Structure formats: structure tokens, C-alpha cells
């Protein structure tokens, strides 16, 4: 599938899903799952004020929804290639989603009570990440995901699993 190599992905409806091998050993216990990515809404050409409710799910469990304020083209993205039209989406917001043993948050703000136990990481060979626009979303403003070659942050989607051992 070509999407794993994409540096810019956008859609107005639906979701994208990634399956990542779960390498937890039997003596390791998840303490925190963190995802970092640069995202924005999606609008034909661009619109800095275009809210979109972006829902994150892990292993089939919706963990929370972030409302992106817009799809930005007011200034050129630091990494956005010169060949990309300056009127199109240029950059997003760098977001940090964290799931702990107590709840889920984004950038230090609580999103939901979903916790690591709910995700059943110990019993799954994969960690399945879904990012998208829910069918019942209030703000259906699409989604843009920026990889390491677009936007302002030189990174792809990063997923880190912190664990303890016994």
C-alpha cells in the first residue's frame, strides 16, 4: 500500500488505518502509549478557519476526538516542497496523543477516560491505529496528515510504547 510512503495524506471523509507489530513481551507491562503527528483539517485549496473533528482509535477503541481549527496556508510550511502550490495546505499542528493507565489526553488536556487496560495491548499481536472523521462527527472538515517532507515538523507519525518489566 502506497500510503505508508506518503509524506502528505488528505481526505474529506473516512479514515486511514495502520497496523504496527506489538513487540511487548510477556514480562513487559504497558505504562503509556504516545502518538505524535502533524495534522490539520482538509479543505479544497485551503481555509484557515475550517473545524474538523478528528477521531483517534486504537485497537478498535475510540480513544478521543480533537477538533482541528483549520487547514492552513497563511504561510508556507517550513518543509513543504517548492513545487507544492502555496495556496494549498501548507502545515498543520503538532499533536501529542497520550494514553496512560488512567485516561487519554492530547497535549496535556484530557480527552477521555479510555486507558491502556481498555486497549488490551497484552493480548494483541498488533497495535491498530485509526485516524479519521467519524460518521456522526459534528464538524466534518476532513483530515490532512503531514509527513517528514511537508509542513513544519520533520517527522512522520511517531508511535512510542513505554513499559515496565518484572
Regions found by a protein language model. Name each.
Residues 37, 99, 143-145:
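Hydrophobic transmembrane signal anchors and adjacent membrane-proximal interface regions, especially
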Residues 26-29, 96, 153:
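Histidine (H) residue identity feature
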Residues 37, 56, 127-131, 159:
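Hydrophobic beta-strand residues in large extracellular and virion-surface proteins
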Residues 30-31, 94, 157-160:
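Generic hydrophobic, helix-prone segments enriched in Leu/Val/Ile
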Residues 132-166:
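Proprotein-processing/basic-patch segments
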Residues 1-86:
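Mid-protein regulatory/catalytic core that forms ligand/cofactor-binding pockets
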Residues 30-33, 85-86, 116-136:
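Noncatalytic modules at the cell exterior or secretory-pathway interfaces
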Residues 2-9, 69-122, 139-141:
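Extended, solvent-exposed segments with strong compositional bias
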